[in-house]
């Protein structure tokens, strides 16, 4: 809500760049993207409590392997599409809504993938989308970095480095930053300016939805 309110009231000015980034996909064994030790994953007996046919849904038939269930299926192209599919709907929802982006006219993907058969999502990827102007709204270039570095920090942002993951909307007037979920928006301005902004925030224009 804050992202759209701040954009609509002109705090950012025209936004021509959006960047979102996350660390490499496969470097954490605690997440939902752990690759198999062999490719393709070897067949294993199906647990008695699992209806493997039902679980696969409309995907092509493949032998069961414990690496798929319950969560690591996200990293395999025949079941999921990695962090791009898992996180973009959260991280990039706010700029899509605020900027009224619609469909891109251009898309490009660069990736580094050590998996021989490319059935598992890449360890590093950089995806670029370009969106045409929408009325008075400027054209936008959006980039998704997955283990492919981060945008360069600009002096006017008042920070030394960007966090491990997040999203920024770079405006002609100001730049906005959020985490991977856009509920913690803040302006990238010097600390004193941000503290003053928090003391005197702009009026809310989008009503909260009732809880019941």
Regions found by a protein language model. Name each.
Residues 2-212:
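Contiguous beta-strand/loop segments that form the cofactor/metal-binding neighborhood of enzyme cores
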């Amino acid at each position: 809500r804050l992202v759209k309110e701040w954009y609509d009231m002109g705090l950012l000015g025209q936004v021509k760049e959006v960047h979102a980034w996350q660390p490499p996909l496969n470097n954490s064994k605690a997440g939902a993207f752990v690759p198999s030790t062999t490719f393709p994953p070897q067949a294993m007996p199906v647990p008695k409590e699992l209806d493997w046919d039902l679980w696969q849904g409309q995907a092509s038939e493949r032998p069961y392997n414990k690496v798929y269930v319950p969560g690591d299926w996200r990293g395999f192209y025949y079941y999921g599409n990695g962090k791009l599919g898992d996180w973009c709907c959260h991280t990039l929802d706010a700029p899509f809504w605020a900027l009224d982006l619609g469909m891109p006219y251009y898309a490009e993907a660069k990736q580094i993938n050590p998996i021989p058969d490319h059935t598992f999502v890449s360890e590093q990827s950089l995806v670029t989308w370009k969106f045409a102007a929408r009325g008075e709204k400027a054209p936008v270039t959006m980039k998704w970095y997955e283990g492919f570095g981060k945008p360069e920090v600009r002096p006017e942002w008042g920070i030394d480095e960007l966090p491990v993951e997040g999203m920024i909307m770079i405006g002609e007037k100001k730049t906005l930053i959020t985490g991977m979920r856009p509920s913690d928006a803040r302006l990238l301005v010097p600390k004193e300016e941000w503290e003053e902004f928090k003391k005197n925030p702009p009026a809310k224009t989008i009503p909260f939805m009732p809880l019941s």
